[in-house]
Regions:
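Hydrophobic cores of alpha-helical transmembrane segments in multi-pass integral membrane proteins
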Residues: 45-68, 73, 80, 86-177, ...
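Functional cores that coordinate and move charged inorganic groups
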Residues: 186-210, 214, 222, 229-232
């Protein structure tokens, strides 16, 4: 009986392969795709980003079934879009968990993407021959920012409304075409029902299609050149008599099993936040967004969601010059674009931070401090002291990129091994100690800042 079932399954597979390259794709991208055998903790976040993308798509579909993109007032003198969200939360079966899954998923999406990008930064995954992989990844980041910004308007709460108003009005700072461009994006002279409808269309259809296309291109480009590893060694250089890399193992089943472990741990953390702290202490869902949008009432403090705050802090840190704020807009845009230019800014011959010299390591630590510091300052009310600190951190941020062609040439690197090396037990213990201290410190620091923010 079992043999008969297997024969039928094989016959079906053969029939499919004759018409569609199913087995070929399986082998090229999983069973016979050889990945370095020394992947570590940092290599979980690529697969986790795919998982969160699926969560966002599925939860978004169910939200769309019950959401109404209408900014006009209903019979209760509340915007229909705002009441649609409240209807989902209160009257739709399981609506509250779908809504929180989507809002929490947005923040977790940026968490795993930022960690994924950081992995590429420390291990030189942007260097030859992976320039296109990095470019596609940078475009994914841009598309993700656009998707998040447009989706942020849809609840039609106070912070959604005024946050969109502030960001869209930034385009009016562009000389000559700015005012017309701002009006064109609005679809009106202000954020209105027209803006809401076009943002809904872009958020639900246009940007997700672009995002999915870029993800496919990113994976195809990665599998064409092969995965990087913590040593920055190209495993394709050393192969056995069968053409198999000596330091490579099949992605399936080895790394699919590894990724399943990562998925389980991630879902435990994700569900813990989802069920017990979906508002993320006011960072995932801000308190003003529980009030309906009111064009006649400005919130005391307008700030973007936490994952945009580093770039928003740079925008605020750059003073107006020659009577225009366009320099802040340029600075904010440059802060994102420079990330995509890393393959050409880095002139060093070594990829991995393990074998980089002290100059690069120092610059990297300063960059991390600057990025986190800007993120914290961007979420807070601007004061003279905070603006000064933000300007200093902005200089550090841009110096990391603009100075890279020079300090990577001057750095003294360590010799790179010909083959990959495995992490020792001591390195693993020290890593988890470092991560634990960092997480606890970040939590305590963020809690203190949140308390100070509430006082302000």
């Amino acid at each position: 009986m079992a043999n008969q079932t297997n024969n039928k399954a094989k016959a079906l597979l053969d029939w499919t392969d004759a018409r569609f390259p199913l087995s070929k794709m399986w082998n090229e991208h999983l069973a016979q795709y050889y990945a370095p055998k020394n992947f570590n903790f940092w290599y979980y976040f690529g697969s986790l980003a795919l998982l969160v993308l699926v969560i966002q798509i599925v939860s978004g579909i169910f939200l769309t079934m019950n959401y109404k993109p209408d900014g006009n007032l209903n019979a209760y003198h509340l915007p229909a879009a705002f009441t649609a969200v409240e209807y989902i939360m209160r009257d739709v079966s399981g609506g509250w968990i779908i809504r929180y899954m989507h809002s929490t998923g947005a923040s977790f999406f940026f968490i795993v993407v930022y960690l994924h990008m950081f992995r590429g930064l420390i291990y030189g995954s942007y260097k030859k021959p992976r320039e296109l992989v990095w470019i596609f990844g940078s475009l994914i980041f841009l598309a993700l920012m656009a998707e998040a910004f447009m989706g942020y308007l849809l609840p039609w709460g106070q912070m959604s409304f005024w946050g969109a108003q502030v960001i869209i009005n930034l385009f009016s700072a562009i000389p000559v075409i700015g005012p017309d461009l701002s009006t064109w994006i609005h679809g009106d002279f202000n954020v209105s029902d027209v803006t809401l409808n076009r943002f809904f269309a872009l958020h639900v259809i246009a940007v997700p299609l672009v995002l999915l296309g870029l993800v496919v291109a990113h994976i195809i480009a990665l599998h064409e050149v092969g995965s990087n590893n913590p040593d920055g060694v190209e495993i394709k250089k050393l192969k056995d008599e069968n053409g198999v890399p000596l330091d490579g193992i099949p992605f399936h089943p080895y790394y699919t099993v590894k990724d399943i472990l990562g998925v389980v741990v991630f879902l435990i953390v994700f569900c813990s936040v989802l069920f017990f702290a979906p508002e993320g202490g006011g960072y995932f869902l801000e308190a003003p967004n529980f009030d309906a949008a009111n064009a006649l009432k400005t919130p005391p403090h307008i700030a973007p969601v936490w994952y945009f705050t580093p770039f928003y802090a740079i925008l605020r840190a750059i003073p107006s010059f020659l009577g225009t704020q366009v320099w802040g807009v340029i600075g904010m845009g440059a802060a994102v674009v420079l990330i995509a230019l890393l393959p050409w800014l880095d002139k060093g011959e070594v990829k991995s931070v393990r074998y980089r010299g002290p100059i690069f390591k120092t610059a990297l630590v300063l960059f991390i401090i600057a990025f986190i510091g800007l993120g914290i300052l961007g979420a807070m009310v601007a004061t003279d002291t905070r603006t000064l600190v933000a300007r200093i951190l902005s200089v550090v941020y841009f110096a990391f990129f603009l100075g890279m062609p020079f300090y990577t040439k001057l750095d003294t690197n360590k010799p790179v091994p010909e083959r990959v090396t495995m992490s020792t037990t001591k390195q693993k213990i020290m890593f988890f100690v470092y991560v634990g201290i960092t997480v606890i410190g970040a939590y305590l620091f963020a809690t203190k800042l949140r308390d100070r923010k509430s006082v302000v």
